[in-house]
């Protein structure tokens, strides 16, 4: 964009680049990074997410000419339907975590957005995906022009910086073991993942009742609350975060010491995503997964994706006792 400045007059609500991501947290993270990278370039970035005040977002769009829009598909559709934004001048279209958008049912919305941009021959299109299933490849063929495929270290799915541990235990013992893990001095910054919103809520409530201050990230929490919680976790004011996979996808925080899988994920790729929250930026991290009678059958699929066996052990004695 810097190498190809726009000649002539520009108008409000006509971005040069659009970045789509599946979750609000991820949009906010990308927006922060874009603003940081563009700090001294004069490029302006606007983030559009559902669950936030539409009027305030519209006000930001209309304050100045917008270069980059980072958005969730649904909220960008809102702007297009109300004719508060136009994509006919888009030069670059970025689709982040396309596989997740496919899983979450966003593809019909994404297709509408893509149709609002110039023809694929007249724009740059970048599609990022953790996996390249036939469905993703089909979308790539529809949306890209003479694409180049870049695959980054496919054989190294799990980072070498993460010490992966699997504790075999009864489901009823998980909370007690979790409390003891959180009480260890090594657990300085911890993300606990559960599969469902109600499970996240229960774990959060029980930890709070036991006197352990922790935050919660799930789809049923208001966007303002989620934003505040994530900021507190990033700053270190909150040491423990309980999250679902969808909400946790926007968590890119250096210094996370532990990831705990309170539930084994039903999708093996979510396991990779979860443990990737620790061991970042060259630091060492620990992932602890609870394998109980309810979910141990999920381990073989995870191991197949990793290309390695996970060492399953009994819970250490010091983590069992109350």
What are these regions (language model features)?
Residues 1-322:
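Conserved helicase RecA-like core
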């Amino acid at each position: 964009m810097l190498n190809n400045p726009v000649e002539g007059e520009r108008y409000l609500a006509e971005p040069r680049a659009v970045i789509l991501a599946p979750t609000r947290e991820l949009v906010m993270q990308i927006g922060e990074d874009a603003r940081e990278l563009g700090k001294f370039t004069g490029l302006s970035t606007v983030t559009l997410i559902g669950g936030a005040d539409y009027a305030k977002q519209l006000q930001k769009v209309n304050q100045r000419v917008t270069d980059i829009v980072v958005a969730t598909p649904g909220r960008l559709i809102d702007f297009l339907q109300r004719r508060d934004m136009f994509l006919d001048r888009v030069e670059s279209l970025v689709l982040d975590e396309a596989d997740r958008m496919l899983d979450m049912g966003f593809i019909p919305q994404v297709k509408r957005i893509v149709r609002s941009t110039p023809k694929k021959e007249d724009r740059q299109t970048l599609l990022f995906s953790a996996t390249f299933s036939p469905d993703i490849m089909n979308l790539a063929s529809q949306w890209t022009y003479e694409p180049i495929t870049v695959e980054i270290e496919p054989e190294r799915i799990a980072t070498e910086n993460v010490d992966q541990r699997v504790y075999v235990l009864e489901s009823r013992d998980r909370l007690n073991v979790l409390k003891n893990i959180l009480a260890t001095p090594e657990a300085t910054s911890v993300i606990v993942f559960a599969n469902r919103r109600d499970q996240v809520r229960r774990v959060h409530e029980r930890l709070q009742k036991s006197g352990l201050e922790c935050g919660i990230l799930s789809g049923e929490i208001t966007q303002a609350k989620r934003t505040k919680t994530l900021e507190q976790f990033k700053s270190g004011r909150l040491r423990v975060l309980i999250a679902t996979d969808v909400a946790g996808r926007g968590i890119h925080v250096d210094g996370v010491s532990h990831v705990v899988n309170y539930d084994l994920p039903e999708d093996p790729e979510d396991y990779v995503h979860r443990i990737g929250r620790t061991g970042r930026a060259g630091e060492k991290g620990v992932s602890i997964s609870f394998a109980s009678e309810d979910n141990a059958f999920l381990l073989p699929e995870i191991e197949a994706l990793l290309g390695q066996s996970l060492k399953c052990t009994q819970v250490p004695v010091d983590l069992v006792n109350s």
